[in-house]
């Protein structure tokens, strides 16, 4: 891997359960904002399922600095090497959060139905890099696999794309 004069940002917008997935349109707004703020950056997209790949392919087409890393690299070992070179990873409370953490990459983690106080933060990560909305019903699920009792996961929909982009900016501009 070669990285010269550009910042590398990872985006892992998916998770195994709905209570852990930030709305796709809002995450695309994060991608758009980071692309606008950092036009010379490289934004690597991570996600492996068929539906996920379709979304990532659309983003790759819309934003010139985006690449679907999971499709391009094809193996977990190669993804881990790439993750180790990122300046920052944006991830849901998901396996990608943990993988990026294990290779020493700082992670802006987005939390919905789950909560970092349950003990599932990425290894070595700081609560300063957590994006979440305080709600009395959280955590409603330790694993994010239970339906939202309020309907529609407001714990995720009330998170602003600007809040996520701001956290990334704080890290990139250090």
Across the structure, where does each feature detected by a protein language model lie?
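Short, flexible, glycine/charge-rich loop motifs used to bind or transfer phosphoryl groups or to couple energy/partner
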Residues: 1, 78-79, 98, 118-120
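Nucleotide-sugar donor-binding and catalytic loop/hinge architecture
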Residues: 1-9
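Short beta-strands and strand-loop turn motifs
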Residues: 10-15
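Glycine/threonine-rich flexible loop motifs
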Residues: 18-23
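Donor-binding and catalytic core of enzymes assembling or modifying cell-surface/extracellular glycoconjugates
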Residues: 24-113
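Nucleotide-sugar donor-binding patch of glycosyltransferase catalytic domains
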Residues: 69, 101-174
């Amino acid at each position: 891997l070669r990285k010269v004069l550009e910042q590398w940002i990872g985006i892992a917008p998916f998770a195994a359960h709905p209570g852990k997935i930030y709305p796709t349109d809002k995450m695309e707004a994060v991608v758009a904002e980071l692309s606008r703020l950092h036009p010379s950056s490289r934004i690597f997209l991570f996600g492996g399922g068929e539906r996920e790949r379709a979304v990532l392919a659309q983003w790759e087409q819309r934003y010139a600095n985006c690449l679907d890393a999971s499709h391009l690299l094809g193996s977990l070992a190669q993804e881990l090497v790439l993750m180790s070179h990122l300046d920052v990873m944006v991830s849901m409370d998901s396996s990608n959060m943990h993988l990026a953490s294990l290779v020493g990459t700082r992670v802006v983690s987005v939390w919905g139905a789950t909560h970092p106080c349950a003990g599932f933060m990425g290894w070595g990560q700081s609560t300063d890099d957590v994006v979440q909305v305080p709600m009395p019903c959280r955590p409603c699920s330790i694993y994010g696999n239970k339906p939202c009792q309020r309907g529609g996961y407001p714990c995720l929909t009330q998170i602003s794309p600007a809040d996520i982009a701001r956290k990334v900016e704080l890290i990139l501009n250090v």
